[in-house]
Amino acid sequence: MINLFRGLLVVLCFASAMVAAEEKNILVTSGSDRAAPIAVVPFGWQGGNVLPEDMAEIISNDLRNSGYYAPIPKQNMISLPTQASEVIFRDWKALGAQYVMVGNITPAGGRLQIQYALFNVATEQQVLTGNVSGTNDQLRDMAHYIADQSFEKLTGIKGAFSTRMLYVTAERFSENNTRYTLQRSDYDGARAVTLLQSREPILSPRFAPDGKRIAYVSFEQKRPRIFVQHIDTGRREQITNFEGLNGAPAWSPDGSKLAFVLSKDGNPEIYVINLASRQLSRVTNDSSIDTEPFFGKDGSTLYFTSDRGGKPQIYKTNINGGGAERVTFVGNYNANPKLSADEKTLVMIHRQDGFTNFKVAVQDLARGSVKILTDSNLDESPTVAPNGTMVIYATRQQGRGVLMLVSINGRVRLPLPTAQGEVREPSWSPYLN
């Protein structure tokens, strides 16, 4: 059964092109605009012990990861103010900074009080000020919060730095001894915790829209089944146990339904189940492989991957009935669709030519243009931040599966720190506050 499941995925993910793509759209390989220089000055600390986290570094990294801002390195800073009255704007103008943030951390009754301020260097005006308090263990949370507030103030886009990520690791100890672990971490890979361990594969973890539940595929008892697990309690509920393939779960926007792939009737097709009534509905009916469903925010539109045209491409359909409409036309392979929050951009795995050149790309759904975001060759499983500014994906580096982050504008691309072993199957959480 495992071999059958993997075989079907290989057929879909690595099928060679049979005919040339219809070139309706255009391909763009990079952008040329520039990130805004910003300085996040090391926060002042009034306590005696060394703090376990560097607030300024976390905030700088968050803003950098968005692709909107280019942090100025600490070693280049002319002065190190920790409060508003100490800011010398000519220092920051000399460095070309557009914005500067200062902050101060004070111990207060077993907690930490953090005050911060953000300035526009050109106008020398304060654009944001605030304070937040918490414990030592909450320093990363507070740093992500400040980054969220700053990003939203400057861009009008809600920050997504306080979100979480799911991923799966596989550690092979011998030929028949591999440990699979489902992990949850901060979006940047920090503070990973284990949600599930198994000697059998774990696939396709997905956060529910409420952020409190997850769905995934487990090969316990040597066959694929879909489970829903409550994060806080660990309580699990088996959702499917059909013969053949049970895979690729995807939540509806209201969390009341799951779409997934079943082959119980002989061919991999997409189904939707109502989690309350357990009513199962078949959505696709084609002789091809249909897989990787993803709901639009209306709860009725379903994007999916199919090779019904002879090669994997992305289609959309309505779960209540009707035909499928092809969405992608650039390249000989497009798969694993995800939508940005505003549904203007489709994120996918794209191959322009060849047999192993799989990259993360985005398609403007209004214009049809496609832009490649990555320069690696074996990318898979893209997942999009809830504000649409960043993508995390799995790829291979030096023979090992790793996770990477790329900004949607293509300016930033970097590896994420994760546990040992093969790392795969990332999934971004919704907003959690």
From Swiss-Prot:
<feature type="signal peptide">
    <location>
        <begin position="1"/>
        <end position="21"/>
    </location>
</feature>
<dbReference type="GO" id="GO:0051301">
    <property type="term" value="P:cell division"/>
</dbReference>
<dbReference type="InterPro" id="IPR014167">
    <property type="entry name" value="Tol-Pal_TolB"/>
</dbReference>
<dbReference type="InterPro" id="IPR011659">
    <property type="entry name" value="PD40"/>
</dbReference>
<keyword id="KW-0131">Cell cycle</keyword>
<dbReference type="GO" id="GO:0017038">
    <property type="term" value="P:protein import"/>
</dbReference>
<comment type="similarity">
    <text>Belongs to the TolB family.</text>
</comment>
<keyword id="KW-0732">Signal</keyword>
<keyword id="KW-0132">Cell division</keyword>
<comment type="function">
    <text>Part of the Tol-Pal system, which plays a role in outer membrane invagination during cell division and is important for maintaining outer membrane integrity.</text>
</comment>
<dbReference type="Pfam" id="PF07676">
    <property type="entry name" value="PD40"/>
</dbReference>
<dbReference type="GO" id="GO:0042597">
    <property type="term" value="C:periplasmic space"/>
</dbReference>
<protein>
    <recommendedName>
        <fullName>Tol-Pal system protein TolB</fullName>
    </recommendedName>
</protein>
<dbReference type="Pfam" id="PF04052">
    <property type="entry name" value="TolB_N"/>
</dbReference>
<keyword id="KW-0574">Periplasm</keyword>
<dbReference type="InterPro" id="IPR011042">
    <property type="entry name" value="6-blade_b-propeller_TolB-like"/>
</dbReference>
<comment type="subunit">
    <text>The Tol-Pal system is composed of five core proteins: the inner membrane proteins TolA, TolQ and TolR, the periplasmic protein TolB and the outer membrane protein Pal. They form a network linking the inner and outer membranes and the peptidoglycan layer.</text>
</comment>
<dbReference type="InterPro" id="IPR007195">
    <property type="entry name" value="TolB_N"/>
</dbReference>
